[in-house]
């Protein structure tokens, strides 16, 4: 049976860069240029902090995440950070985000990058995938603190 989804590192299909930047922008409102700059740094091997995507059978992006130095919080010592984790609503509940998270952690570990961190307000989701709560952090422009997790 054919796999319903394809999981990939952006370096496997760099031609998706513009579509990926537009997709992440549509989900999070961060300017496309910011995504493009990070993706270019990764594709040009200026950094090993990557971008990971899930495509459906039609080649459409249905989920993704990135890894950046700092994800808009006050603990700049906790780096790098998983960012922009998103799965299209119609594709949720299928373990896609978990596979992407694992893919990123394994890839980073293979490059000697560990631990990795993420900021979220979700409780219970990331723990299922081996993430551990570390502390509360203040996210830029947010009145309430957010949860910081780590994975080794």
Name every feature range the model reports, one short phrase each.
Residues 53, 60-70, 81, 86:
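Conserved beta-strand in the GNAT
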């Amino acid at each position: 049976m054919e796999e319903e989804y394809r999981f990939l590192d952006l370096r496997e299909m760099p031609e998706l860069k513009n579509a990926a930047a537009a997709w992440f922008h549509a989900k999070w409102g961060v300017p496309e240029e910011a995504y493009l700059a990070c993706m270019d740094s990764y594709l040009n091997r200026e950094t090993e902090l990557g971008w990971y995507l899930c495509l459906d059978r039609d080649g459409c992006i249905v989920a993704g995440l990135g890894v950046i130095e700092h994800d808009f919080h006050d603990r700049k010592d906790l780096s790098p950070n998983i960012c922009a984790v998103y799965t299209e609503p119609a594709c949720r509940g299928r373990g896609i985000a978990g596979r992407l998270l694992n893919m990123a952690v394994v890839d980073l570990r293979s490059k000697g990058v560990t631990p990795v961190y993420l900021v979220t307000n979700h409780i219970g989701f990331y723990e299922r995938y081996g993430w551990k709560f570390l502390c509360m952090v203040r996210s830029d422009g947010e009145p309430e603190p957010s949860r910081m997790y780590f994975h080794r």
